[in-house]
């Protein structure tokens, strides 16, 4: 019997034999954890009027919407590894790569799903939750489910034909080096033609199954979109008029921005790409991103509707977040991988039954999610592991604060983000080789690097001191 077959066999036995035990724990809150790849706070509930996201917005009306939530590193694998272990990234030791593996980088850490599993929960992973399907696979009650085993291991040409591009004309735009198809596609197909429609249907099926089991559950649902390529069914493209989509008002590089601030070049590896300076490209790309967000919103709506229909909504905490941000032309960038606000700030929406909710301005970061869910569900946290802080006080009162700043890292750069300032330094050894400071009170778009400002000299000095202190704390062996 193969290892995967063995895992499934054990999972089935566990499913049957645990029903009686789980059934005695009806007082426990469930968790529906929804994570979307590359989704920035470009949602109606974040004040974006152009985008169509009625289902997320509906949940947000009953939830706490965090206005200043930050990932701890702006790349998928590392961000998720940090989030699901409650441990900060640390160069070069752990959680630094796009395909970071939490088990390898931090083998002693107990993952969030495993923590719940050890405390009587049935835990399921659908879609892209951890970046790698094998990462912490045994943390789950069942082997992690994806539409395909692991797309990154497939030949790109086969991958293109099989999953991503449905229009025949798309085959004319295959990139000669990467063999990827065009960066976007509008195909007149059903929602389940693309991966995320299937992820939603699997999650709905699991909700029904879990309802029958009468178990406390942690159900994770990971959507691939709005990650590139911006492929979504045509009906979601049709929600928008391309010529009316507002383009970034600051498509230029700020003066005195450190050379270390660049962006991921992934969009250049897709067919049909021309240049980011071309307005036609900008409009098509932003249109595609919006269509993908609306597509994901519709899938989330289906899942939330089923949660309600099954009578589980009042016993289930719902979390919706993006794994980091993404530039849509701001400062000329189309991607992530930097310490600017558009790459590091992410949507975080948490609905807790019987909590009032509201818009929360206090700073939180992804390492805070693990201890928060444990506190809400009365699950003991692993001793000596978690580096974040529970934001339950904010869920109870959206005016409260739990910390002064978030700490974000990227390739030798270290960033502190408070409600007012964003300050970053780049180090080579102990020497500072790059600096940036933005006063978010007067410059929310981050268009002017204030690093040379005389009036802010004391604040800048203090922020740099805090960065160095935090960096030293994290360099201690875990």
Regions found by a protein language model. Name each.
Residues 2, 6, 21-435, 444-475:
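Formylglycine-dependent sulfatase
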Residues 8-17:
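Bacterial N-terminal signal peptides
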